[in-house]
Amino acid sequence: LYTKDSKRLSRETLALFDTLVYDIADVGCRYYTFLTTLRYCIEDCAAAGKRLVVLDRPNPLGDRVEGGIVRPDVISFVGGYEMPVCYGLTCGELAEMMNRELHCGCDLHIVPCAGLTRSMTFRDWGHCWVMPSMGIPRFETALLYPGTCLIEGTNCSEGRGTGDPFGIIGAPFIQAEAFCKAFNALGCPGLEATPVYFTPTASKHQGVLCGGIQLHILNETVLEPVAMGVRLLDLLRRMYPKDFAFLPPVREDGKIFLSLLAGHRDFEKPDWDADALLARYAEE
């Protein structure tokens, strides 16, 4: 499903089986592309007359719902369905919803989780965290990811190539102490930052000394990661207007990657307002 030429099931692959079993751990966040892969599996199996069995898994973020709804004009691999960033469903529930609302007609079967309650998070499972990918090494990473993944659409490092991906944010032009003080002054619930200097071993700014912050979760029950991510973008553009930038368009239609992540094009407007944007998210 992650080959270079296509992310869909090919005719040749579909001809190899009668039933496809989907057994993939997710992180409860729309950017994490396993959910788009699930949509493709539903659509491709429906078109080919194949059965799809989803082994349901609990959502590590529980019933957390946050962020705006993806607009139809920015549907992409990081936003493959019109839903919020944190969606509060299990993969089985999401599969049923997509199959129904997209009118796929897939022969879909869900093997449910035993003993699951809606409010459960990973803390309630009684298991060790198993990395769903190298970028999400800890549960704490999954908690921050809905907010700090927005940094992937900018010229700042989101911490890839460090020991704390999505927990360390920075760039060569950032003065760590001043930026940390300004971030903490925002009063993001459940969070505190400390200044950090780091040199990424991979991805953006590889081999270059960066200043920035490391995020520490003090109270995950009041955490608002998407709101934190929006305020982080706003702080970066205000403190470093000459250096901070969104990455250039990645598609022929001119849409920037940040718009695909966010699920809307508001960030492309020079006068976007963080408070107004977060108020709209809450309404949606």
How should these model regions be labeled?
Residues 1-16, 29:
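Glycine-rich oxoanion-binding loops at beta->alpha junctions
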Residues 26-38:
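Glycine/threonine-rich flexible loop motifs
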Residues 45-51:
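A short helix->loop->beta-strand "cap" motif at the edges of active sites that frequently abuts
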Residues 75-148:
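Conserved anion/nucleotide-ligand pocket segment
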Residues 116-196, 200:
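Glycine-rich, aromatic-lined ligand/substrate-binding cores of catalytic
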